[in-house]
Amino acid sequence: MNRGSLDDGPKLREEKHFQDFYPDLNADTLLPFIVPLVETKDNSTDTDSDDISNRNNREIGSVKSVQTKELIFKGRVTTEPLVLKKNEVEFQKCKITTNELKGKKNPYCVRFNESFISRYYHINKVRNRKSYKQQQKEFDGVEAPYFTKFSSKEAPNITISTSTKSAIQKFASISPNLVNFKPQYDMDEQDELYLHYLNKRYFKDQMSHEIFEILMTTLETEWFHIEKHIPSTNSLIARHNILRDCKNYELYGSDDGTGLSMDQACAVCLGTDSDNLNTIVFCDGCDIAVHQECYGIIFIPEGKWLCRRCMISKNNFATCLMCPSHTGAFKQTDTGSWVHNICALWLPELYFSNLHYMEPIEGVQNVSVSRWKLNCYICKKKMGACIQCFQRNCFTAYHVTCARRAGLYMSKGKCTIQELASNQFSQKYSVESFCHKHAPRGWQTSIEGINKARKYFSLLSTLQTETPQHNEANDRTNSKFNKTIWKTPNQTPVAPHVFAEILQKVVDFFGLANPPAGAFDICKYWSMKRELTGGTPLTACFENNSLGSLTEEQVQTRIDFANDQLEDLYRLKELTTLVKKRTQASNSLSRSRKKVFDIVKSPQKYLLKINVLDIFIKSEQFKALERLVTEPKLLVILEKCKHCDFDTVQIFKEEIMHFFEVLETLPGASRILQTVSSKAKEQVTNLIGLIEHVDIKKLLSRDFIINDDKIEERPWSGPVIMEEEGLSDAEELSAGEHRMLKLILNSG
């Protein structure tokens, strides 16, 4: 039963850009809002402010007063309260009335005219925007005072009176990488706590949230530009890992999709195909690849993504309850244990509680005692739960991952992952798995894979992950970039000393107390913040800013170069199309030539295959014989029929008739077998009768001139036919024949 059409749960998707939903909304447009300021000594009795204060107090009261954060260390999860001072985090009674908000002399109202910080201080001139002409009567973004989200107790001591042009020039003079600077960093609760620490120790409560975000954006911008000049070793490491996986696959096989091909396969279904609704996602912790549908990934994050095992207990050794494998895609059970997704899909007692998120795995208690006692014939380990060969009279047991590593036949048919996860599927779509002895015809032998798997488990304790050796060689080179450590082993950036100097200049620009130790601590905090995110950037890419620093000549040069490259690509596309057509024609010619030589070499074999064997193999009688016949000698004859291993029609007739005679006299033969045998014998006899007396060589000689390997088409077949019929060319008539011919003509 397919549950997909009846379930209205969340669907697999990717992150969308906000302009997909609001195409007219500009990212630089400021949306005005007003918040109450903190309470001062003087109390206001204005009714409007009372209403605002009461409303905000009610809203704050509905939220939990104490928030906690989870800390995960060595697999243990602990909680820690996240508490700030009450008078610093809660909005309190506002002393400014609504009518006084337009005042220009109020010390709490800071008018930001035009600033280089477009995110917080720059007010868009909405009168120039067509989509906002209707709103100019209600709100004037140029004349109205503007409040930021964060307001301090006292009057702000930062008043930006510098014009936008001079401010941008000032930032560009601090560092050439800060041209067209725009703050893009967003603070979180952790940053809020660290900002309180900085203000208390270094900046005397002068650093605001906006300045802190500017400093963090500055560090991200500087690192973005410096990282472009650092030699990358990721490609070498990735290449080494691919070669290592391929080598391990050749030696020991694979149960998680690594090493099968250059394109890593899904660890659950071993598929490499993907689309926009079901893409393959790689874990940034263990580099495992899984489909969204196979692992239950509803939403693909913008940054790094970790599988469940790396997220919860990356440093601990995960052991599957159902098999001895330690690699692959894991999910937790309802009791906290680990089980492979593929094990849960193939064991009939297990199922997924949530089919969209594919977790938790339930039904472990339903696994029968007899299944726990089965011994895997591949790894020889007495652990976990095994499945058995689907052949009716075969009881061979093996683990799911052992079968995957050995390359046994495992097919889910037309069942979907959702149906397998819920154990709700039709009987005609049932899954199948066979041992190496009962694999379907055409499936490659698994003997070599079984030997690889046994070798892997016998050497499991001594296997160690290879480490690339090129890093040490790179560190010993004379490159100036390798003399300085730019990243930690965890790919965390290390801020150089120049970053602290740039931060000091930025802080001086705002006129704050500027101890050098404060800039160094901010750089350390930024590095730890990047380490927390696995080395991923804290802001969006700065490519637009870097392109904005180019001159018109440089931009035009890049455009011309791109156009030249585009023309070359078009030419290359045409050449590849022609090469493809030539290759297809050459392959077709080779196939036709091979077919012609096969016909000339063994004409009766070709005649037998086309007119008898192809028809007989596709018949229901032949398929029934494959199922019912168990004698090895008789099965050999059926295999010869499938591969057309008969040189002449007479040889085939003798062997197939002997086959039917043995079946008729076979002791203990069932009635069904005898009936099928008689029908098949009748069919083969009729087919042989159609070609038994056909001289294929004689027919070929009429149309072709065959001399060893040289074959030419005969221009006219008349002489050959005359020779076959004993005819000769036209001769002169005698006198008697002339008189007889005239007599016949006159009498007519």
Curated annotation (Swiss-Prot):
Zinc finger (PHD-type): 263-313, 374-439
Residues annotated with Phosphoserine modification: 728
GO BP: any one term: regulation of transcription by RNA polymerase II
Keyword annotations of the record: Cytoplasm, Metal-binding, Nucleus, Phosphoprotein, Repeat, Transcription, Transcription regulation, Zinc, Zinc-finger
Gene3D superfamilies: Zinc/RING finger domain, C3HC4 (zinc finger) (3.30.40.10)
Signal sequence residues: none
PROSITE patterns: EPHD (PS51805), ZF_PHD_1 (PS01359), ZF_PHD_2 (PS50016)
Top-level lineage group: Eukaryota
GO cellular component: cytoplasm; NuA3 histone acetyltransferase complex; NuA3a histone acetyltransferase complex; NuA3b histone acetyltransferase complex; nucleus
One GO MF term: methylated histone binding
Nucleus found in the keyword field: yes
Residues in C2HC pre-PHD-type zinc fingers: 317-350
Predominant location category: cytoplasm
SUPFAM superfamilies per record: FYVE/PHD zinc finger
Record-linked InterPro entries: Enhancer_polycomb-like_N, EPHD, Histone_Mod_Regulator, Zinc_finger_PHD-type_CS, Znf_FYVE_PHD, Znf_PHD, Znf_PHD-finger, Znf_RING/FYVE/PHD
Localization in the cell: Cytoplasm; Nucleus
Extra facts: Present with 172 molecules/cell in log phase SD medium.
Subunit description: Component of the NuA3 histone acetyltransferase (HAT) complex. The NuA3 HAT complex has 2 functionally distinct forms that participate in transcription. The NuA3a HAT complex is composed of at least NTO1, SAS3, TAF14, YNG1 and EAF6. The NuA3b HAT complex contains an additional subunit, PDP3.
UniProt xrefs under PANTHER family: BROMODOMAIN-CONTAINING PROTEIN HOMOLOG, PHD FINGER PROTEINS
Entry domain remark: Residues 156 to 543 compose a region conserved in chromatin associated proteins.
Record's function text: Component of the NuA3 histone acetyltransferase complex. The NuA3 HAT complex has 2 functionally distinct forms. NuA3a binds H3K4me3, through the PHD finger of YNG1, and acetylates H3K14 at the promoter region of actively transcribed genes to promote transcription initiation. NuA3b binds H3K36me3 at the coding regions of actively transcribed genes, through the PWWP domain of PDP3, and coordinates transcription elongation.
Protein name: NuA3 HAT complex component NTO1
Species per Swiss-Prot/TrEMBL record: Saccharomyces cerevisiae (strain ATCC 204508 / S288c)
